[in-house]
Design a protein with these regions (language model features):
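Membrane-inserting effector segments that mediate pore formation, membrane fusion
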Residues: 102-154
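Charge-rich, solvent-exposed alpha-helical interaction surfaces
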Residues: 5-8, 54, 116, 221, ...
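Amphipathic, membrane-active segments
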Residues: 44, 48-70, 76-102, 143-200
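Intrinsic-disorder-associated interaction segments
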Residues: 2, 23-26, 37-44, 48, ...
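Amphipathic alpha-helical interaction segments
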Residues: 16, 26, 33, 76, ...
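An N-terminally focused, membrane-permeabilizing/fusogenic/translocator signature enriched
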Residues: 1-78, 232-239
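Long, compositionally biased interface segments
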Residues: 183-185, 192-239
Length: 239
């Protein structure tokens, strides 16, 4: 009796297959055990120059070539290897831009707008115009804004007022810091809005074109810095 029980328990460990109507069935689910593969840990940095140095110094240590540099967004770059023998990739490096991201489209108090224009934008004619405009806005008992969708005028009545009546430019070319500082910040147009609380808003008006321009600039940076590695086929840059 004990012998039969032991034999029964042993039989439970066996995987049995059955053929029914030309198909093979198993009486238990099989789970594939993937082979262990040593892979490097992903390195996170904040600059494009760091990616160039890592690729230049460690490329000869890698077996699975080429290495792909993918510009994911204006603020992120990923580097990974090609497929290996078990169809896996090594995630090597990630660069994430740590420059402050300008909050386009949000209302900013008068003082905050001045600080943002001086710290979060590359100086150009557009920032000069806005700083001059804001310097001539004063608190009053009230204000009236007239807006026909094309232009806006501000006059004193309640909230804020320009020290003299004038028409405000609606579309202004600006270059906020929106991508890695190693490349030129893209210029794009913004729509300027003013309200009765002395707040301003800058709304992107280029349909997101600046994102493609930024990614192209980042890709061009790598193509210049890693020209030799790209030419011999060990590095591929893509967007």
């Amino acid at each position: 009796m004990l012998k039969e029980a032991i034999q029964y328990l042993v039989s439970l460990k066996e995987n049995k297959t059955y053929q029914l109507n030309g198909e093979i069935y198993s009486d238990r689910e099989l789970v594939r055990v993937a082979p262990h593969v040593d892979r490097p840990g992903e390195v996170r940095v904040n600059g494009l120059d760091s990616i160039v140095k890592l690729v230049s110094h460690e490329l000869d240590m890698l077996e699975n070539l080429p290495v792909y540099i993918r510009v994911v967004s204006p603020r992120q770059v990923e580097v990974f290897s090609t497929l290996d023998s078990v169809m896996g990739r090594d995630d090597l490096y990630v660069a994430v831009c740590d420059a402050p991201d300008f909050a386009a489209g949000k209302w900013m108090p008068h003082e905050n707008a001045i600080i943002a224009l001086r710290s979060a934008f590359v100086p150009n004619e557009g920032t000069e115009y806005l700083l001059d405009l804001l310097s001539r806005i004063s608190k009053e008992d009230g204000v009236t804004t007239e807006d026909n969708g094309v232009s806006q005028t501000v006059s004193a009545r309640q909230g804020i007022a320009l020290k003299r009546f004038e028409q405000v430019r609606q579309r202004i070319a600006l270059r906020p810091y929106r991508t890695f500082t190693e490349v030129e910040q893209p210029e794009s147009e913004f729509i300027l809005r003013l309200n009765e609380d002395a707040e301003i808003a800058l709304i992107e008006a280029d349909g997101g074109r600046w994102k493609m321009d930024s990614k192209a600039a980042v890709a061009a940076y790598f193509e210049e810095k890693l020209a030799g590695e790209i030419q011999d086929g060990r590095v591929v840059v893509m967007m």
